[in-house]
């Protein structure tokens, strides 16, 4: 008997959750009842605040990302909560460089720090290891967001790269969450001058 009562309560709870989901998925903005029911269920079963899939109404731009520290120093990267990750590659030189810009086939020496968008935490940093990263631009050694985002970078530049999932690690993740937006601050330590 006790098992049947527990089973009955479980089924009833599942029915309430399914109904709330149906209201959320299919309800209109004009339905105060649907909004009220959804809010009540959400408030009792989930933490307050927007979810990762809830749109904030606009995509972030480079100026929304906070970066402290100068060229050669490990940066602190701050991702805001009030905008969505960009759907296209964004690059911005935070510190200008000098000399010729990087082109395909050139070997670059870069320092970088990576923060993942979803959890706003540093995932990797050559600054922390004390050794810059070397790559040949256009040789397929790095993710497409780096290949495209470092094109034209000049020696001495600090460049922000906001890389959407399709130019990063995509659905496979490869050490990050699937479909993760990546935020890099890169320092062009060496760009060939000739």
Predicted regions and their residues:
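Cross-family detector of peptidyl-prolyl cis-trans isomerase
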Residues: 2-194
């Amino acid at each position: 008997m006790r098992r049947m009562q527990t089973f009955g309560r479980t089924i009833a709870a599942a029915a309430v959750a399914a109904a709330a989901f149906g209201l959320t998925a299919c309800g209109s903005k004009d339905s105060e009842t649907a909004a009220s029911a959804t809010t009540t269920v959400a408030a009792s079963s989930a933490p307050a605040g927007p979810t990762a899939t809830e749109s904030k109404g606009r995509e972030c731009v480079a100026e929304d990302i906070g970066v402290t520290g100068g060229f050669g120093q490990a940066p602190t990267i701050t991702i805001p909560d009030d905008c969505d990750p960009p759907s296209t590659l964004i690059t911005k030189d935070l510190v200008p460089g000098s000399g010729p810009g990087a082109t395909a086939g050139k070997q670059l020496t870069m320092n970088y720090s990576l923060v993942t968008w979803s959890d706003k935490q540093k995932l990797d940093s050559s600054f922390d290891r004390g050794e810059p990263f070397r790559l040949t631009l256009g040789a397929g050694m790095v993710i497409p967001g780096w290949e495209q985002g470092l094109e034209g970078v000049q020696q001495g530049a600090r460049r922000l790269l906001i890389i959407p999932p399709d130019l990063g690690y995509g659905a496979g993740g490869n050490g990050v969450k699937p479909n993760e937006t990546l935020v890099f601050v890169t320092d062009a330590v060496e760009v060939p001058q000739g």
